[in-house]
Amino acid sequence: MRRPMVAGNWKMHGTRASVAELTKGLSNLALPSGVEVAVFPPALFINQVIDGLAGKEITVGAQNSAVQPEQGALTGEVAPEQLVEAGCKLVLIGHSERRQIIGETDEVLNRKFAAAQAKGLKPVLCIGETLEEREAGKTLEVVGRQLSSIIEAFGVKAFADAVIAYEPVWAIGTGLTATPQQAQDVHAAIRGQLAAEDAEVAAKVQLLYGGSVKAANAAELFGMPDIDGGLIGGASLNADEFGAICRAAGN
């Protein structure tokens, strides 16, 4: 049985004061025991959040990590070993904003994925299509290619210690949301692609949906058989809203 997971991606939001307030709100939440809860603050605030959530069953992750496992001469980057030392357990790899705006390629993301795993940092691989790709009927082709990039480089068993988040780019921060059935169809295809390589890995990997998930639509999305939780953007910046989404996953 796959454990539900709700992960909050804070993106490039926060000041010391607002992060302290949000962290306090999260620490006061009554979270369902059966749900794995994680937050991904900006790198500058990782230590502050870890300290603020001490004793709380909330995992802290990073939004990005370097292409090499160890510290070294790579200006502006943070190495997986440094993130692990700080207390991170997870890292987002390939979020659409990094693919689309920063220009990260599958090759770069493969290196980041491997570097993270080499230091015991669990990757959350983000995959998804743009509106143009969906309208052209290329959703499964695009998602399949992004998934295959990792499988071809490292084998499907790389996903035995990873999470996959499907995030249709057109639904991120737009207020648009894939219908539960649209999301389920893609999640089923992802699990099917993995199962063609290794049924055991496919059955165990957590598949999250990301794309304007809110308390109002979370229960319906999470009720789908291949949706194991959510990667939450804007709604994760409100502790009460995030708590409601976590409870929806617990139900």
Swiss-Prot record:
<feature type="binding site">
    <location>
        <position position="173"/>
    </location>
    <ligand>
        <name>substrate</name>
    </ligand>
</feature>
<dbReference type="InterPro" id="IPR000652">
    <property type="entry name" value="Triosephosphate_isomerase"/>
</dbReference>
<feature type="binding site">
    <location>
        <begin position="9"/>
        <end position="11"/>
    </location>
    <ligand>
        <name>substrate</name>
    </ligand>
</feature>
<dbReference type="InterPro" id="IPR035990">
    <property type="entry name" value="TIM_sf"/>
</dbReference>
<comment type="pathway">
    <text>Carbohydrate biosynthesis; gluconeogenesis.</text>
</comment>
<dbReference type="Pfam" id="PF00121">
    <property type="entry name" value="TIM"/>
</dbReference>
<dbReference type="GO" id="GO:0006094">
    <property type="term" value="P:gluconeogenesis"/>
</dbReference>
<dbReference type="InterPro" id="IPR013785">
    <property type="entry name" value="Aldolase_TIM"/>
</dbReference>
<dbReference type="GO" id="GO:0046166">
    <property type="term" value="P:glyceraldehyde-3-phosphate biosynthetic process"/>
</dbReference>
<dbReference type="InterPro" id="IPR022896">
    <property type="entry name" value="TrioseP_Isoase_bac/euk"/>
</dbReference>
<comment type="pathway">
    <text>Carbohydrate degradation; glycolysis; D-glyceraldehyde 3-phosphate from glycerone phosphate: step 1/1.</text>
</comment>
<feature type="binding site">
    <location>
        <begin position="233"/>
        <end position="234"/>
    </location>
    <ligand>
        <name>substrate</name>
    </ligand>
</feature>
<keyword id="KW-0324">Glycolysis</keyword>
<feature type="active site" description="Proton acceptor">
    <location>
        <position position="167"/>
    </location>
</feature>
<comment type="function">
    <text>Involved in the gluconeogenesis. Catalyzes stereospecifically the conversion of dihydroxyacetone phosphate (DHAP) to D-glyceraldehyde-3-phosphate (G3P).</text>
</comment>
<comment type="similarity">
    <text>Belongs to the triosephosphate isomerase family.</text>
</comment>
<feature type="active site" description="Electrophile">
    <location>
        <position position="95"/>
    </location>
</feature>
<dbReference type="GO" id="GO:0006096">
    <property type="term" value="P:glycolytic process"/>
</dbReference>
<keyword id="KW-0963">Cytoplasm</keyword>
<feature type="binding site">
    <location>
        <position position="212"/>
    </location>
    <ligand>
        <name>substrate</name>
    </ligand>
</feature>
<dbReference type="GO" id="GO:0019563">
    <property type="term" value="P:glycerol catabolic process"/>
</dbReference>
<keyword id="KW-0312">Gluconeogenesis</keyword>
<comment type="subunit">
    <text>Homodimer.</text>
</comment>
<dbReference type="InterPro" id="IPR020861">
    <property type="entry name" value="Triosephosphate_isomerase_AS"/>
</dbReference>
<protein>
    <recommendedName>
        <fullName>Triosephosphate isomerase</fullName>
        <ecNumber>5.3.1.1</ecNumber>
    </recommendedName>
</protein>
<dbReference type="GO" id="GO:0005829">
    <property type="term" value="C:cytosol"/>
</dbReference>
<dbReference type="GO" id="GO:0004807">
    <property type="term" value="F:triose-phosphate isomerase activity"/>
</dbReference>
<keyword id="KW-0413">Isomerase</keyword>
